[in-house]
Amino acid sequence: MGAGQSTNTSGHGASPEEMSRILAHRFASKCFTPLELTHLKDNFYSLALKQGDIHYWNEEVLSRFLGIPDGDEKFGLGTLDAGPVIFRMVSYLGAFPFQNTLAPSVLTFDAMVKVIVLLTDRYGKVLRRGKKDRIKLLFGSLADIGRKEASPITSGDKSDNDQGRPKTRSDEAGFSVDKPSNDADDYNDDDDLVLAALESLDAIEVFKHDQRIDRTAYEAHISFDTFQRLLMLFVVIAPLQSCEKTSEYFSQLNEESLKSARYCVENILTSFDIGDRTKGIDYETFYWVISTSLPYMFDPLTPLFEHLLFSKNLDLSRRKDSGTCSVSEEKQKKTEFCISPSHPPIILPGSFKPCILDSAVISHLSFFLSTSFPTPNLLQNGTRLHGVFSSDTHGESLTSFSHNVLTWDAPSILLVTGSINHSSGDEADIITVGAYIPQPWKLPASTSTSHYDTSHQSQLPYLFQLSPRYAVMQGSPSINSLKPNLPVVSFSTKSGIAIGCKIPPPTRTSMDSSRPTPAGSGSLWIDPALENAEFVMSNGLSHEEGVFLPPGIARWSPSRPPSKAESETIKISIYNIEVWGVVQTAPTPAQSPYHSRTSTANGDIPDAVARQQANWNFEAREAERRREIHLNVGGGDSEEQTGRALLEMAGIIGDSARRR
């Protein structure tokens, strides 16, 4: 793939096109297996248009292959017309690392190689700075201001083998978003830097060649319309796997699911909205929100573009048998998965019918919630959700909540929906808040303290608001050093459910009726009747240290630090409460402590669902045993008291039994 070109090639006379081509060859040899390259070539050249010696893809071919809507009004108002957005992104990324000179690029095979590397998270071997550089590239690919138009392909020029294509020359002005704003700082050793970068595969240095002092990038904006269409695509295809047909996700859409997806997208857009939407989204806001509140939002691009690495025209089984290609066990698993009809749904069978958790909410959760390591995205790491509690199904009772939730010994997601109680008497808005609890809920009488592995985000709690606006508060890295009266979650039949709250000491008159108070940057309190809740969010200056960090929203970015304490308390009239248990079906490198929990009651049971059922069976047997003992004691009052005293001393009933 041109590996011999770099070491001895003089970079001083090489054009950007030549350097870009050499880099594409290095990307191909470094980031793909021979089998993947074979599939990619077959997919590309079997559909490529041709002009002279140039093979390329246009927007229509790209959208048709990926299975995404392109100018389809079926879904209404163009909200799912993602084809033009994806095409503009790849035409920008295909010019990497010379966007200033070559963008928008023609989608040749070399350009497509670079696009796939950048969009499928394979850039880690060449992009030293990783995520930050990728976010900047993604921003540039979506920014509107200063974008030049590619030469259109007229219908009269189209044919099966010959179509007009956008002309790109190195002396043309590219995207002004990428144009260096201070040419006086140019250096004479730029070609040396590029040559050294190609020799060492240090792509970030190549990137700097075209982005030396890119101050104008911070002045460009992404239009909300463009970003809305991209978000709609992500919400719909978030569960997509590499070998699934993308079109099936769109064919299954109905009016209800479309409405839910639009509502989800609008809520997410609020986190980018810091003023006038007509101005669009600037780079600082984009970078800050993506990195702090939506770190996995672009993950659907990985399986979407990995479609290019699987060709239906090639006989994979014959290739493996003949030994013509070296295929690792991981690649064999991908091949086996490719022929399966579909992946299992994330909600396990036997769960209750959800009132809050729909496909759009699941997609939204996957954009920020880390449930395992090293693959955090819950739709890509084998996570399954089991219905643990629903106020609609199990009733609005803390007794029922305790029976279902406190016997669940794995992570869980709490979701609460209701109406906002406005003091002004305005029409109530529907709000959805929730929390991710990475460890089992504890019994009220439990005295043990929880320890959280702060090295993995999946082991830290989250507190979040999903609608009508979006905000997320991550668990504090210093969570293990907090005082005992600042637990992540507290449960009491008298004071209710508290998450991230400060628990007051019990009084003599009432052991636990004192109401928990907000602490830190976020908290959620639900009253004992499960009828009302209070959701508190602050910038960290209005309350003492607590479980959660301030919300990672744009107006509190590092360059715009809060000058004074800001806090918001939202009073909620609860409609529904749901608790979903998190079950890992894929093996993780380091099994969490709660997976190894065993006892005489449940033994060595492989998953949390079976362990919970075993706990319930054990409790039922114990209740039956107590009833039989009680009946054998006698019916008189004095005899009953004597019998109860004997049972308490034996540890069968009372506080001693609860602590066993």
Curated annotation (Swiss-Prot):
Which Pfam family, any one, appears in the UniProt record?
TLD
Under the cellular component aspect of Gene Ontology, which terms does the record hold? Answer: cytoplasm
The listed locations are: Cytoplasm
Where would you say this protein principally sits, based on its record? cytoplasm
Q: Where is the composition biased (Basic and acidic residues)?
A: 157-172
Record-annotated TLDc domain positions: 355-583
Is Iron-sulfur among this UniProt entry's keywords? Answer: no
InterPro entries the UniProt entry points to = TLDc_dom
Q: Which family does it belong to?
A: Belongs to the RTC5 family.
> What is the name of the protein in this document?
Restriction of telomere capping protein 5
Q: Which organism is it from?
A: Arthroderma benhamiae (strain ATCC MYA-4681 / CBS 112371)
